[in-house]
From Swiss-Prot:
Keyword tags: ATP-binding, Cell cycle, Cell division, Cell shape, Cell wall biogenesis/degradation, Cytoplasm, Ligase, Nucleotide-binding, Peptidoglycan synthesis
GO biological process: one example: regulation of cell shape
Keyword Thylakoid: no
Protein name: UDP-N-acetylmuramoylalanine--D-glutamate ligase
Domain of life: Bacteria
GO CC, alphabetical: cytoplasm
Keyword Glycosyltransferase listed: no
Family: Belongs to the MurCDEF family.
Length: 466
């Protein structure tokens, strides 16, 4: 018997998470209504096959979808403060989300006490850190899965295991967006981290303070807090009475904290005074990825009790994820082409630039989502030889970079931008696609943007794939 049995549940939004919630609620005996403003949402056929009794509402709808409803499950893309979700709250209807349903499921299945949950959020680096943390836990012998915002949906993993009659994961490594955290209750992870907080999604939040406060709710519960001491907003999230592990790209002050130190001219990842791994041996490019690696090690120590010394081999073996400062092509004179199409906000692009150890020709621009582009200026001055701008908010980026003494120009599309960037790059330079913007003004998604960039780079004379 489930708390969902017999309840009339409305699922708002039929993306990956919404579809997983709908399928799970139907499996647990709920009466189901699903509403999506799109006429043909992507999961429609799957929903009809897996939940044939579900009532499906597509296109325009109003508050009538709340009639008879006991519980409203929100997809991450649905803002709980406006529209039907706000009306549901006004009527006193409880709101839930995928992470709350996962927590409830683990309790009802009687496995929560044997399960470890590691939760990861941050403006930048959370997908890489999630994948790395899961890989480290697996290397230590645990049945660990990465799920959530990283895909697959956590409830999809749960349903697949149950359908196969397989044991449930010993460790869930969950990437959580701020949108997912908004509807998260009672997850109580064994360890959680906020990697960083910079401008993003300010089209949804009133400002950076509200955005940061939403991220900080990941620490709800009793688990170990893993905090970035180099980010003032994150460092301020420390809660009284909680176990803390701090990390950063600086030298650690405490013996159980993580950081970077210089020894005889070489940088090392360390825990306290103990050297773990030379930065030069880290496969992931950039000091920002060193910080992500330190966060992953701290999560495994704090949440799983695994000593970092056991995990250095797995760190070296981890090859990273596509579209995150990924080397995709190289010219015969040593110019390298890097795809950071996942760099959809200013903080990500600043981190990518600062992670480079050579002059950079930057390709940036797209849908800026209301961000302040001024933090790009210092990083561009430090690292960039030139900047080629594309997309809707190219003029706003140009305005933020005016007077930087770095060459700026516009290109009509990404293919032309790659050609122009290659012309400006000198031997040994990097051409970096790190847009600091979303992609939907010109592309289907960030992966499509990456495909166009990679194809354009590999068409250039004397360029080969990497």
């Amino acid at each position: 018997m489930s708390a969902l049995t017999g309840k009339h549940v409305l699922v708002l939004g039929l993306g990956e998470s919404g579809l997983a919630m709908a399928r799970w609620c139907a499996l647990r005996g709920a009466r189901l209504r699903v509403a999506d403003s799109r006429q043909t949402p992507p999961g429609l056929d799957t929903l009809r096959a897996d939940a044939p009794l579900a009532e499906i509402v597509v296109g325009n709808f109003g508050a009538e979808v709340l009639s008879g409803i006991d519980l409203v499950a929100l997809s991450p893309g649905v803002d709980p403060r406006i529209g039907i979700a706000a009306e549901a709250r006004h009527r006193g209807l409880p709101l839930t989300g995928e992470m709350s349903l996962l927590a409830q499921a683990l309790d009802e299945l009687g496995v929560r006490a044997q399960t470890r949950i590691l939760a990861i959020t941050g403006t930048n680096g959370k997908t890489t850190t999630t994948a790395l943390t899961a890989a480290l836990a697996q290397a230590a012998g645990l049945d660990a899965v990465a799920a959530g915002n990283i895909s697959p949906a956590a409830l999809d993993v749960l349903m697949d295991r149950l359908a196969q009659g397989a044991p449930l994961p010993e460790c869930w490594v969950l990437e959580l967006s701020s949108f997912q955290i908004e509807t998260m209750h009672a997850l109580d992870p064994e360890a959680a981290t906020v990697l960083n907080v910079t401008d993003d999604h300010l089209d949804r939040y009133a400002g950076l303070d509200e955005y940061a406060a939403t991220k900080a709710a990941i620490f709800e519960g009793r688990g170990v807090q893993v905090l970035n001491r180099d980010d003032a907003r994150v460092a301020a999230m420390a809660l009284p009475g909680r176990s803390l592990i701090r990390f950063g790209a600086s030298a650690p002050a405490a013996t159980d904290d993580y950081g970077l130190v210089e020894v005889a001219g070489a940088a090392w990842l360390v825990r306290g005074r103990e050297r773990l791994l030379a930065l030069a041996d880290l496969p992931l490019a950039g000091r920002h990825n060193a910080a992500n690696t330190l966060a992953a090690l701290a999560l495994c120590e704090g949440g799983l009790g695994i000593a970092p010394q056991r995990l250095t081999g797995a760190v070296v073996a981890f090859r990273g994820l596509p579209h995150r400062v990924e080397l995709v092509a190289e010219r015969s004179d040593g110019v390298r082409f890097y795809d950071d199409s996942k760099g959809t906000n200013v903080g990500a692009t600043v981190a990518a630039l600062d992670g480079m150890d050579c002059p950079v020709v930057l390709i940036a621009g797209g849908d800026g989502k209301g961000q302040d582009f001024s933090p790009l200026r210092e990083a561009v001055v430090r690292r960039a030889r030139a900047v080629v701008l594309i997309g809707r908010d190219a003029p706003r980026i140009e305005s933020a970079l005016q007077g930087s003494a770095v060459a700026l120009e516009h290109a009509p599309d990404l293919d032309a931008a790659v050609v122009r960037a290659s012309e400006q790059a000198q031997p040994g330079d990097a051409v970096l696609l790190s847009p600091a913007c979303a992609s939907l003004d010109m592309f289907r998604n960030y992966a499509h943007r990456a495909e166009v960039f990679i194809a354009a780079a590999r068409r250039l004379p004397e360029v080969r794939a990497s």
